[in-house]
A protein has these predicted regions:
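Active-site and donor-binding regions of nucleotide-sugar-utilizing enzymes
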Residues: 1-60, 69-81, 90, 101-105, ...
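Generic beta-sheet signal
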Residues: 5, 30, 48, 99, ...
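A donor-sugar binding/catalytic signature common to diverse glycosyltransferases
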Residues: 25, 123-171
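Charged active-site motifs of nucleotide-sugar-dependent glycosyltransferases
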Residues: 61-67, 95
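Nucleotide-activated donor-binding/catalytic signature segment of Leloir-type glycosyltransferases, i.e.
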Residues: 109-124
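Catalytic binding pocket for nucleotide-activated donors in carbohydrate/polymer assembly enzymes
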Residues: 149-200
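Conserved donor-nucleotide binding/catalytic region of nucleotide-linked donor-dependent transferases
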Residues: 195-223
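C-terminal alpha-helical cap of glycosyltransferases
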Residues: 228-245
């Protein structure tokens, strides 16, 4: 038997690719809308929930810092750090945490040494940082789902080259780019892309988030319910053992 756990995101990149997945006996997916997508193509999909919900639980937040997440790719980091620096310079009364993925990324942060309202962190786990924060600004990626599951209101940002943006806009067939918004099919986190991704606009959305926290936190909770399962990783493993005999 052929089991395909977490298949390619054909619902993003084009439905033609779905034909190759018919070779599998079981398609095991981790997002609720994928079940309906495959059903439309007469393919049965197995869904027990998203495995991230086993590991990311809502964190009690007592701090007042703003978490900045520039991404992991060099291009993302170099695009976002100047924007983050402008925000740090504008909001001198706020305290910031700049979370990097690697010590190799420190070479891009020389300009940040002159600011006393920002702390650069590399090794600390995200869930241990979130408790110290009131919101985050995060480069689009799976980290946006982690932030939502941890309960931290966020702004999703992304900058790329104009050509890559045009190609992505042409290929992508979905309305949102961040996973929390896709799950709920609603805007939980504002998405500021390309020309919208500039400091003053981000600052405006920060203010708006803090003024509407109860509504945003309710949406975050509704999103969690959509992807939550009971012992998700164990459920997929049990299914593999049972059906793989």
């Amino acid at each position: 038997k052929i089991f395909y756990y977490i298949p390619p995101k054909v619902w993003i990149w084009g439905e033609k690719r779905v034909e190759k997945l018919r070779l599998a006996d079981y398609i095991m997916v981790i997002f609720p809308w994928e079940v309906d997508f495959y059903k439309k193509h007469n393919i049965s999909a197995i869904y027990f929930g998203n495995p991230f919900t086993d590991f990311y639980k809502k964190v009690e937040r007592t701090g007042n810092k703003i978490l900045l997440l520039p991404g992991s790719r060099r291009q993302e980091i170099k695009a976002m750090l100047p924007v983050f620096e402008e925000i740090i310079n504008d909001l001198k009364e706020d305290k910031f945490i700049l979370k990097l993925n690697s010590t190799q990324d420190l070479k891009y942060t020389e300009n940040f040494k002159k600011y006393d309202n920002v702390e650069i962190i590399i090794d600390k786990k995200l869930k241990d940082i979130v408790s110290d924060c009131k919101l985050s600004v995060a480069t689009s990626g799976t980290i946006t789902l982690e932030l939502a599951l941890l309960g931290l209101p966020s702004i999703v940002v992304y900058k790329t080259t104009f050509i890559n943006y045009l190609i992505g806009k042409y290929i992508l067939k979905i309305g949102y780019i961040s996973l929390p918004n896709l799950v709920l099919n609603d805007e939980i986190f504002p998405e500021l892309i390309q020309k919208d991704c500039e400091a003053k606009n981000i600052e405006k959305h920060m203010k708006k988030i803090l003024e509407n926290l109860p509504e945003i936190e309710e949406k975050i909770e509704n999103m969690r319910k959509k992807v939550e399962g009971k012992a998700v990783v164990e459920s997929y493993a049990d299914f593999l053992v049972k059906e793989g005999k």
